Amino acid sequence: GFSGDHVNLYGMIYTELQEEFDAVAERVLGLTNQEELLCPKHIISMALELLKKYPSPVNMSDIDIALTAHKVILDYCLWENNFHMHLDQANMLTIGLDDLLSANASNHERYAYLLQQRGKRSV
């Protein structure tokens, strides 16, 4: 059920994403020296706009929550691919940044798999 998912699946994802965000923020600041890119108000506003595309998990079944989370992470994986390509084309993709983004993308694809498995309905 949801409580087990919350601790075991979503808890793991939340924790890892927080660590990932901190590492990316440090890298962005180190490479650009532009603190305004890391403004919490700006980041939260952008995240809210993106989340408006997806249904609220309120009153959803545990399966539907997993399926919605799966859609969110798949969309993010596609965005990541485009972001990586744009950085490369702009000659802003350092070896270290490429390594960090690739490791993050690998984790996100793992989340997609785990969420897909959780979203399977019992037959």
Where are the model-predicted features located?
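Short, contiguous alpha-helical
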Residues: A23, R27, D98-V123
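Helix-loop segments that flank and shape redox-cofactor active sites
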Residues: G1-M12, L31-E35, E80-G96
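Residue-identity detector for glutamine
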Residues: Q18, Q34, Q89, Q116-Q117
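Charge-rich, low-complexity amphipathic helices
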Residues: T32, C39-P40, M46-L51, R110, ...
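Charged/polar, solvent-exposed surface patches and flexible loops
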Residues: E26, G30, V72, N82, ...
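Conserved alpha-helical segments that form or flank metal/cofactor-binding pockets of metalloenzymes
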Residues: D5-S45
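Generic structural concept
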Residues: G11-Y14, Q18, A25, K71-L74, ...
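Acidic/histidine-rich alpha-helical segments that form the ligand environment
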Residues: I43-S106
